[in-house]
UniProtKB/Swiss-Prot annotation:
Uridylyltransferase (UTase) activity is inhibited by glutamine, while glutamine activates uridylyl-removing (UR) activity. This is Bifunctional uridylyltransferase/uridylyl-removing enzyme. Residues 1-332 are annotated as: Uridylyltransferase. Keywords: Hydrolase, Magnesium, Multifunctional enzyme, Nucleotidyltransferase, Repeat, Transferase. It comes from Vibrio parahaemolyticus serotype O3:K6 (strain RIMD 2210633). Residues 693-777, 800-874 form the ACT domain. The gene is glnD.
Amino acid sequence: MPLQSPLTFSDEQINIGELKQELEKFSSTQKQEFLNHHPVTSLVLARAEYMDLLLTRLWQYFGFNDIYNISLVAVGGYGRGELHPLSDIDILVLSNNKLPTALEAKISEFITLLWDLKLEVGHAVRTVNECAQIGRDDLTVATNLQEARLLCGSEDTFQALKKVVLSDSFWPSETFYRAKIQEQRERHARYHDTTYNLEPDIKSTPGGLRDIHTLSWVARRHFGATSLLEMSRYGFLTDAEYRELVECQDFLWRVRFALHIELRRYDNRLTFAHQAQVAENLGYVGEGNRGVEMMMKEFYRTLRRVAELNKMLLKLFDQAIINGGATENAEILDADFQRRGSLIEARKPALFQARPETILDMFLHIANDSTIEGVSPPTLRQLRTARRRLNKFLHTIPAAREKFLALCRHPNALHKAFSLMHRLGVMAAYLPQWSQIVGQMQFDLFHAYTVDEHSIRLLKHINTFNNPDNHAKHPICCDIYPRMQKKELLIIAAIFHDIGKGRGGDHSVIGEGEAYDFCIEHGLSKPEAKLVGWLVRHHLLMSVTAQRRDIYDPDVITEFAKQVRDEESLEYLVCLTVADICATNPELWNAWKRTLLAELFYSTQRALRRGLENPVDVRERIRHNQQMASALLRKEGFSARQIEVLWQRFKADYFLRHTHTQIAWHCAHLLRMDDPNKPLVLISKKATRGGTEVFVYTKDQPALFATVVAELDRRNFNVHDAQIMTSKDGHVIDTFMVLDQHGEAIDESRHAAVIKHLTHVLEAGRPTKIKTRRTPNKLQHFNVKTKVDFLPTKGKKHTLMEFVALDTPGLLAKVGRTFADLNINLHGAKITTIGERAEDLFILTSEAGGRLSEEQQNELRDKLIEKLSDAVTA
């Protein structure tokens, strides 16, 4: 049935019930048309037109047409004639003089009806003079009035308003421009000045619709241009820039429309909760999260294009219009470039098209000259044109390859040149592989940035290793990097480390081959190319080994050292690893990770220097730890006999897996105990290995691990490592490395309460109830399949279990309870949280003390998957 025009609604139809039905019918029709691929521009304009007709009819119904000198005016986005399904409908009831009380009451009825219809109406009732006064003081009001459009009522009253708004005294063009630039700067700062936010706001994020609006507002104020097309006619945009902005706006409108038809309340944020459905509405499909990632890739690329155009056009406007073309004197840099103020500019109008390799010369100048802060607007426009007209990638030009390698070797390029090259599209113009990762996101909570943005941040983090002020944060890297002979090898590895993502298959393997080929093409030796390729292939090796393997097992160190081969590779790898972690998510790096990587680095360094054919003597390490710990204990007044009697109860593994200071600390408290049958809980006052050590000594009891981690979870602490041991006389000697919610050591003010509550549950001697908490909303939109794998343990008496699951509340306690239910002994745990994923390693033995049989492994796998699947769906 065709839609009825609101203008034809009878008085009888004007009631909340029937009007709601008509609005729902219109919205439903628009939704279906959108899903059937009707042009979004026509839908956005049609919605505004429908509201025009509805408001006009209601204006008539309330009898306002019979009242002289009042007008109904659309302002803001509605004034532009643009409405999305949940857009605000901003209206102004305009009059020449203050309205009588009775008329104000009737207008209030009119507005109330609109609200009752669930329309997002923003309104003001003002005289022309009030609009002028408020508009002069309020930039937002002034901007809205600039887009005012008469819906119905007095034309004369509306024209009186337009006369005020268009006058130079209302908001002079330059004043308006400066205010809008500051407003945009503040808005961008709220989004951390990046287009790459995980849950971006379609409207307000840098590169979003507001950046297009800002261009329109500035041009409208100066030229009177009312559309993007008129902006191009005034010469504010070239034809190509006009077409690009229209294309970008169309895409952003489609994303916004697709979002709004899924929401009940106004929102422009592409949250995780809605990204999948929006992608489906837009026709992006693929296995798993592929559809979302494809949509977000195009979305981020669009934001980059808008942000680049916005910045360039506003600078051009400032230079050519506001400053009347006045410029500073230029300082000639060479035959091709000059510096004007803090900006570099090309000296010839078609330089980049005639000799594309000079694009890289420009960035070498930027790296060389600390006073250059950016590229002049005309040169930026020339660069954009040349970039689009390139018929081959820049790396195919021999002269360009020399210059790119020179940038990789330049000490200042990491700080200045590469990020600007990326932002201006030069990295993508140079490397075809880079162009494929631009805007490539990963639908998870771990990667805070797109692949390209992450890679640029990685380069910047490498540069921080040159600064002595960062030595406390990155001691190993700050020692290694400044003396590294061929830093360019690390830089190239950083550029390529994630370049294979988004293409299917193992991105490390893809990147290895491409990095090797790149090095050979750029004139590096085969050994250098092999090292770079190896770094790309194994860029996750050190992080995984440190966080998810038992690095106190000499066999683990030997195996890692075999893969690394030599100290040079180890030094390159640790720098790449640390920078990679820091550039993945600002919240990832902490003292715990720093300590783990340092322990792995130094253990491997010792193994390489000793020679892999000379493995560590375990018995010698135990003797060393005992001698050092004994000396500390004797200083505290304990006799050799007391120490010997206590240590006779301990197994050798205890002395192997703890430092001598830990052993002395534990044993001093154990020797002072009045009743050795009571539980002992200790908490380290100083951070140990970057975290807080919680030591537990008590008689063995069922599900002890689950009891301890459940109690720590109750206090919102996270266990990252656990050493689970039993003495020869049936006591447990457990050590837990714990961090708070912010990845820091536990504040000392909380120690007493933790000791008290842990002691209480241990004295109770029964498994504590696991605290049930609702899965956080942000986790509910991720599907992490529970996965249990058993790793080969040749020659070992234990079984290694790798475990992946959604990081739900109480997860670790549930896993520990499952071990207890199946009479499986836990000897150690490495706990790693990667965004929404828990990726843990457990060291297990059977009740009899040996490796788990295949039957036991299968039973454990089935039980864990069953229990955790129930927990997620509960």
